[in-house]
């Protein structure tokens, strides 16, 4: 299983009936499998609300979609609390 951290760039698709998402994330680090700074993440995330520009950690399998290229098929998502000074709210 691969763990990937990134900032939510945008929600490309959301099926409200089954909570299936297609997301675009801006990667927080360099990954060998990534073809650039962005990665598509797909998966079903029940009882979870995404906020654009927030940092998330995804766990899943890297897949090669025949039409859309490299994606992370995620089964786990967690918000990441940033630990730098700019992230602190007073």
Give the ranges of each region predicted by the language model.
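Short coil-to-beta-strand transition motifs
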Residues: 1-5
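Long, highly charged, low-complexity intrinsically disordered interaction regions
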Residues: 12-90
């Amino acid at each position: 299983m691969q763990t990937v951290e990134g900032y939510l760039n945008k929600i490309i698709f959301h099926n409200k009936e089954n909570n299936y998402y297609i997301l675009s994330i801006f990667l927080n680090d360099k990954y060998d499998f990534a073809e650039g700074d962005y990665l598509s993440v797909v998966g079903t995330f029940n009882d979870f609300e995404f906020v654009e520009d927030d940092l998330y950690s995804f766990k899943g399998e890297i897949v090669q979609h025949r039409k859309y290229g490299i994606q992370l098929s995620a089964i786990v998502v967690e918000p990441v609390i940033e630990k730098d000074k700019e992230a602190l709210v007073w």
